[in-house]
Design a protein with these regions (language model features):
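N-terminal transmembrane-helix/juxtamembrane module of multi-pass inner/ER membrane proteins
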Residues: 1-113, 128-142
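Short, flexible coil/linker segments at or flanking structured domains
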Residues: 5-8, 76, 87, 105, ...
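Second-shell loop/turn segments in exported
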Residues: 114-118, 156-157
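Alpha-helical transition-metal enzyme core signature, strongest for iron centers
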Residues: 120-128
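Membrane-embedded catalytic cores of phosphoryl/pyrophosphoryl-handling enzymes
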Residues: 133, 137-253
Length: 253
């Protein structure tokens, strides 16, 4: 006789599928209950991710003159390009290797952990791209041809920085996997690595410093939310974060 069907929507079905299928199913679950819209407080320049009726992440778009002022920083950091070129090229699509080096993460030994981290990264990409679309901020090279990025500038907005979102999310997830406190040496190293990955994107000429700050805010919040949806912590314990300060246009920072 043929094998009996499993129960409808049984979690054990996931073990039968390819990783990309599990990721697609997980993303559907993660995005459930989340909505995006202009912030009620400042709809002309702020955009937010809502869970129910509460804002989970709110980002304010810096004015154009602020980005112009930060061009000086982007151009000055270009001095580090020769030193960091190898890192910049490797980190285009592979951040986990750098942070995994802190924890001994191995794709063969830690297959399920790698798949779990990838689901978290795909979740981060889905959210960050919605913010980039909404806020529509131009890249450094669109303000000045003298920036001359050393790699191709991606065709999506500069703010927030996607690599920062993903780097800080991975740092938090690896900290949780390791069971390390916030002041543990490995946690500190993971945070430093996330900061360096973010800085490298500025050095490459792809981003402004403010993009990294907004990305950190988003990455840490999404990590908490992801962990809550995985049952690691209460969903109501996720801290809402915002980056809505008054930007100091004259100083560019």
């Amino acid at each position: 006789s043929p094998p009996a069907h499993p129960h409808v929507d049984h979690a054990k079905n996931l073990l039968r599928w390819e990783p990309w299928v599990r990721t697609s199913v997980a993303l559907t679950e993660l995005m459930e209950g989340l909505t995006f819209k202009a912030s009620d407080g400042n709809p002309e320049s702020s955009f937010a991710l809502f869970r129910g009726g509460d804002a989970l992440i709110t980002l304010k778009r810096p004015p154009e003159v602020f980005f112009m002022a930060q061009l000086r920083l982007v151009q000055s950091w270009a001095e580090l390009r020769e030193e960091r070129a190898a890192e910049i090229l490797t980190q285009i699509d592979n951040q986990i290797a750098f942070q995994g080096a802190v924890t001994g993460l191995n794709a063969t030994r830690h297959r399920w952990s790698m798949e779990w981290l990838n689901i978290g990264l795909q979740f981060a990409v889905a959210v960050e791209m919605r913010f980039k679309q909404a806020l529509g901020c131009r890249r450094p090279v669109e303000y000045s041809a003298q920036v001359q990025p050393i790699i191709t500038t991606p065709l999506h907005g500069t703010y927030p920085m996607g690599h920062a979102v993903q780097a800080y999310l991975v740092a938090r997830l690896l900290q949780t996997l390791g069971g390390w406190s916030n002041d543990h040496p490995r946690t500190t190293q993971l945070q430093r690595q996330a900061q360096r990955i973010s800085t490298n994107r500025i050095v490459a000429g792809l981003h402004f410093p403010v993009d990294a700050t907004a990305g950190q805010v988003m990455g840490e919040t999404l990590a908490e939310y992801f962990l809550a949806r995985c049952g690691v912590k209460p969903i109501d314990g996720v801290k809402a974060r915002s980056y809505v300060q008054k930007f100091k246009e004259a100083k560019g920072g």
